[in-house]
Amino acid sequence: MKVTLPEFERAGVMVVGDVMLDRYWYGPTSRISPEAPVPVVKVNTIEERPGGAANVAMNITSLGANARLVGLTGIDDAARALSKSLADVNVKCDFVSVPTHPTITKLRVLSRNQQLIRLDFEEGFEGVDPQPLHERINQALSSIGALVLSDYAKGALASVQQMIQLARKAGVPVLIDPKGTDFERYRGATLLTPNLSEFEAVVGKCKTEEEIVERGMKLIADYELSALLVTRSEQGMSLLQPGKAPLHMPTQAQEVYDVTGAGDTVIGVLAATLAAGNSLEEACFFANAAAGVVVGKLGTSTVSPIELENAVRGRAETGFGVMTEEELKLAVAAARKRGEKVVMTNGVFDILHAGHVSYLANARKLGDRLIVAVNSDASTKRLKGDSRPVNPLEQRMIVLGALEAVDWVVSFEEDTPQRLIAGILPDLLVKGGDYKPEEIAGSKEVWANGGEVLVLNFEDGCSTTNIIKKIQQDKKG
């Protein structure tokens, strides 16, 4: 089964922000300079790549979506190189040329895949008349599904508040990659995407995930944001929205070579996915997968649809994590043809905690593929009471599907997954807790088919109920 990517070809996004040219000089290093204690690089390769807001636009078109880029440049070779490079990848450029300023350029010198130095050539565009930028935004609003404002504090977004108001008036979502500590200037945006360092520079050091959520929700309220996405490097990313439970997604990066431009990739994929008509939760899932790909590349890079598809599939031929029952049966049949052992478990998995993660990792070690069956919202309510679930089914399944230990996630409507298990007939059925094997739903069917049933222990002290009680006690205190 192929992963269903968003319909990127129908997505139109405008990117407005600080555009720049990234230059890379590569070469071997074998000696130290006699003039100073620095390495001598014998340059043998020179590359030029669009950077800043231009890299955001390239990330959008690399997915097959349509991107129009607006920014400030000089009238120079760097501007011409930018325009040519972007035209080659189908980015529609609509630059405002400023004859008194040079195009922002950053030169990096690298040897043996290590960056030795960066040299910046820039004066910034503070004080430049923003009206031509506003006119370009106004002209495009009727034909785009999202507006990205890419802020590198170089002057293109000096009038960012007016830009936000233009988009809000037209009903177009505004996504902003912020810069600096003055988030007041982004008031009214649809989504801000700070990294953890940028976030903590505004709200203070956060020692726990709970502090990130609490301070993030206050920031949303203070600045009238619709949502906040905090990218947290090896900790993944956290989506916060008023009236909804936090959505924490673990990182999907396997190796990290260079984080240059990773933020551009995240906001580019977010915008393209939203403009294609997908939900914000889905957009974050795809952006998280794309970030895991791009940090494994050197320098500012983009992600192709094939790379994104492979990333969200996680394991080459096994399909997308979240599946329908029919899709799951096909995936299981294919796994069995390859001689793989299929393990299955089930639960509510409302607020994912360390006990869940440890349990699922241990279950996965018992076979080659792990299926997690999840109670629907109605099933959870019948099982746990009217106040549950805290997290809706879609969010619970997305988070489970992002875990490395989990291959496939499927939901069921009944009080128990007996019917579902009887249809799948895993090689091994596991359940956490104090059950006896014969008490586990589906055990009779699995045994009758020659399979095994096993009870695994949960980590002591970890439970969703205890987490909820602690939150309630903290609020009272």
From Swiss-Prot:
Biological process, per Gene Ontology: ADP-L-glycero-beta-D-manno-heptose biosynthetic process
InterPro entries attached to this UniProt entry: Bifunc_HldE, Carboh/pur_kinase_PfkB_CS, Cyt_trans-like, PfkB_dom, RfaE_dom_I, RfaE_dom_II, Ribokinase-like, Rossmann-like_a/b/a_fold
Matching Gene3D superfamilies: 3.40.1190.20, HUPs (3.40.50.620)
GO cellular component: cytosol
Catalytic residues in the record: 264
Region (Ribokinase) location: 1-318
Entry keywords, A to Z: Acetylation, ATP-binding, Carbohydrate metabolism, Kinase, Multifunctional enzyme, Nucleotide-binding, Nucleotidyltransferase, Transferase
Keyword ATP-binding on entry: yes
Pathway: Nucleotide-sugar biosynthesis; ADP-L-glycero-beta-D-manno-heptose biosynthesis; ADP-L-glycero-beta-D-manno-heptose from D-glycero-beta-D-manno-heptose 7-phosphate: step 1/4; Nucleotide-sugar biosynthesis; ADP-L-glycero-beta-D-manno-heptose biosynthesis; ADP-L-glycero-beta-D-manno-heptose from D-glycero-beta-D-manno-heptose 7-phosphate: step 3/4
Annotated function: Catalyzes the ADP transfer from ATP to D-glycero-beta-D-manno-heptose 1-phosphate, yielding ADP-D-glycero-beta-D-manno-heptose.
Family per record: In the N-terminal section; belongs to the carbohydrate kinase PfkB family. In the C-terminal section; belongs to the cytidylyltransferase family.
Record-given protein name: Bifunctional protein HldE
Species: Shigella dysenteriae serotype 1 (strain Sd197)
Lineage of the species this protein comes from: Bacteria, Pseudomonadati, Pseudomonadota, Gammaproteobacteria, Enterobacterales
Gene: hldE
